[in-house]
Amino acid sequence: MHSKPSRLPFSLALRLTFFISLSTILAFIAFTWFMLHSVEKHFAEQDVSDLQQISTTLSRILQSPADPDEKKVSKIKESIASYRNVALLLLNPRGEVLYSSAQGAALRPAVNSADFSEHSRARDVFLWTVEDTARAMDTGSGMKMETYRIIASSGQATFQGKQQNYVMLTGLSINFHLHYLDALKKNLIAIAVVISLLIVLIIRIAVRQGHLPLRNVSNAIKNITSENLDARLEPTRVPIELEQLVISFNHMIGKIEDVFTRQANFSADIAHEIRTPITNLVTQTEIALSQDRTQKELEDVLYSSLEEYNRMTKMVSDMLFLAQADNNQLIPDRVRFDLQSQNSLKVFRVFSEALGPKETPILLLKFNGMPCLVEGDPQMFRRAINNLLSNALRYTPEGQAITVSIREQESFFDLVIENPGKPIPEEHLSRLFDRFYRVDPSRQRKGEGSGIGLAIVKSIVEAHHGRVQVESDVHSTRFILSVPRLEKMIPDTQCWE
């Protein structure tokens, strides 16, 4: 069954362009809407003000008792003429027309609307749209719609020689305003489309230019290969947003370079370590075959070859052990035990007895007898301590003592193995636990050490969530093996076998 390939995420440049453009366009749309709304509101306020002023003026003219009808009509026409697109309709209570301007008939249907009485009592302004039949006939085009703002008022006036009630509808055509708003809206939409395209283009260019340092960093990273792992990026030459990325990348490259260097040295060292016993075996065999040998001589050659085979076997076993540690396959059997129990002390006593009383240094144990509870694999701990003691023995001058002590820390027990001898230069201390690393620049093997004993110690300690470190001064060298401590005695506590 074939799995569907996952869709690649959008590029960072596309995302930035989209979101910035969208934000800018939405802001422009909001500004356009606000401007249209402001213009429309201004027109409405202006129309209402004009209608209220016209209605007040006309009511004053109608309610003047001294003026005859003709004079009132004349004043009404003069008042209307001073405004543009004003329609007036004057009705008596029976609905008969007392006076109508040229466009007054368009207001007649508004009287029959359901909300007219309410608008009339409140004297508020309302909208009314009618079909402009006259204008459609004049222009010969389709039916036109005329929209008015209307204010209705009522009162009593002397008209046609008698006092009578009237209803006055004053309307102001707003088609001019509506046409202006419609044209403004279309123009703004066209401008918005053009500006939006320009915004997207400008932002795209700006984002691409802004990503130039990122592309430069990417190109610089592409140029780093296994042949120039010493190359580093300059954090001071990139924007502050990329500074931490460059620092982290340099740190990663430093680790990779260190791994490559160690791998190269490891390959050379293991080749040297294996070549030496193989060369010895070949040489011994060639010498043995160069002439007739007695049985005793042949046995000596075989015993010598067996020693070389054992040394190679131990080296291969150690390398397999380290390979397990590298692949996180080194899983210790965890049991609880006391570092200072009698069975635990046997590890050191057996080693001390094996040293002999004269020609080797003395092993001193400085334990306080208090419980030192830890959890781990006793066999692995034995191997780590044996490696440290063997290393201390190798570099301790004749007749001087190796000291083993335990120090209590807040959450660790420190097992300290200290031996006198020449101080180790500080620049070598951090590399002592590397495989086949030697303080001697010639990197030649001396004695019986394989060069990976301390590396095994480090792997064992780290598998137990501990740490190992080394200190050196003019008096002595101290290897400190720190193991997590248990807080209290556990009933099933075991000891080293």
Curated annotation (Swiss-Prot):
The keyword Nucleus does not apply. The chain crosses the membrane at residues 16-36, 187-207. It is a multi-pass membrane protein. It holds the Pfam family CusS. This is Probable sensor kinase SilS. It is an enzyme of class 2 (transferase). Residues 1-15, 208-497 are cytoplasmic. Residues 208-261 form the HAMP domain.
